[in-house]
Design a protein with these regions (language model features):
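C-terminal single-pass membrane-anchor helix
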Residues: 227-266
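Solvent-exposed, non-transmembrane regions of membrane-associated and secreted proteins
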Residues: 1-237
């Protein structure tokens, strides 16, 4: 019975430990910020990179396509916004679905299993006119929630990018579902400052991509957690609660049958 309860509780325990680890990584990132001079120099380099990227009109690929991992200015790309030398650019915060995850270079499988990946050939996430950063993560993993609750977001929801000591605010202005090869909505648009969050959908099938796009808005001090109404109805939570309940029911059923058999044998 104990083993069954442990198995049923595994997703919740695993996700809790993962989120604690992410918080430690974010705290470490915030303490490793560069000096003002270094930051200004780095940001200028990133702005130049983003300008060159926009001018090059490069091809944007599906974040989950292993064949599309090559990127514009690859060597330079890996060194930019690499504060802790571990590929972490900054972190993403989505208050309404209680997400705080590190953002890393690239969308390789190792990145997507452990955090949010920045899609190569899209703008680095420092904001500015004529930029469009694309951030992706998995949904539906049994041991981590990641972007599973992205489907709960609505137009008007605000999310934040924390990078180099600054907080950039984005208001969700468009939510769409596309086929994986249709990446037109991920391209840079002149004069616009966008960030698009991407994950697989529908839950458990993953045949399409869910895009949650945010437009840049002025940052104002965030509400406290108590004032923010968290979005409810998580499929991740619902699925594993059902699984846990079913597991516990089966355990008690077998225990009950076992006791009945023993009594009849006496």
């Amino acid at each position: 019975m104990l083993a069954g309860l442990i198995i049923a509780a595994y997703p919740f325990i695993s996700n809790y430990l993962y989120e604690r680890r992410q918080q430690d990584i974010i705290t470490s990132y915030e303490t490793q910020q560069k000096t003002d001079t270094e930051t200004n120099e780095e940001l200028e380099n990133v702005k130049e990179y983003n300008k060159s990227l926009a001018a090059a009109n490069v091809t944007v690929t599906d974040p989950f396509d292993p064949e599309g991992l090559s990127g514009f200015g690859r060597r330079e790309y890996e060194t930019l916004l690499n504060v802790n030398e571990e590929g972490m650019m900054g972190y993403l915060e989505i208050p309404v679905i209680d997400v705080r995850l590190g953002i890393y270079h690239g969308t390789g499988e190792n990145v997507l299993k452990n955090g949010v990946g920045h899609l190569k050939n899209t703008s680095l996430p420092i904001g500015g006119e004529g930029t469009h950063a694309v951030l992706s993560a998995h949904a539906g993993l049994p041991e981590k929630k990641l972007f599973t609750d992205l489907e709960l977001m609505k137009e008007g929801d605000i999310f934040y990018i924390h990078v180099f000591g600054e907080t950039l605010a984005y208001e969700t202005d468009r939510i769409t579902v596309i086929e994986p090869h249709n990446t037109e909505d991920l391209k840079i648009q002149e004069g616009k400052d966008y960030v698009t969050l991407v994950t697989c959908t529908p839950y458990g099938i993953n045949s399409h991509r869910l895009l949650v796009r945010g437009k840049r808005i002025p940052f104002v001090e965030k509400e406290t957690d108590k004032e923010i109404e968290k979005r409810k109805g998580s499929q991740w939570m619902r699925q594993y609660l059902y699984g846990a309940a079913a597991g516990i029911f089966i355990i008690f059923l077998f225990v009950g049958i076992y006791k009945i058999i023993r009594i009849r044998r006496i």
